[in-house]
Amino acid sequence: FEVYWNVPTLQCRAVYKMIFKLNRTYGIQXNA
């Protein structure tokens, strides 16, 4: 049961980190 909830959490973290990087990289370019 713990593993079932742990896997989606790790995936969400990876996606969140990717979005944060893209937002930081392209967000600055778009704003500038």
UniProtKB/Swiss-Prot annotation:
Presence of keyword Cytoplasm: no
Tissue localization of expression: Expressed by the venom gland.
This enzyme's EC code(s): 3.2.1.35
GO molecular function term, any single one: hyalurononglucosaminidase activity
Top-tier EC class: hydrolase
Catalytic activity: Random hydrolysis of (1->4)-linkages between N-acetyl-beta-D-glucosamine and D-glucuronate residues in hyaluronate
GO CC, alphabetical: extracellular region
Keyword annotations from UniProtKB, A to Z: Disulfide bond, Glycoprotein, Glycosidase, Hydrolase, Secreted
Glycosylation sites: 23
Subcellular location: Secreted
Keyword match Hydrolase: yes
Protein family per UniProt: Belongs to the glycosyl hydrolase 56 family.
Other remarks in the entry: On the 2D-gel the MW of this protein is: 37 kDa.
Functional description taken from the UniProt entry: Hydrolyzes high molecular weight hyaluronic acid to produce small oligosaccharides.
Protein name stated in the entry: Hyaluronidase-Pk1a
Organism: Phoneutria keyserlingi
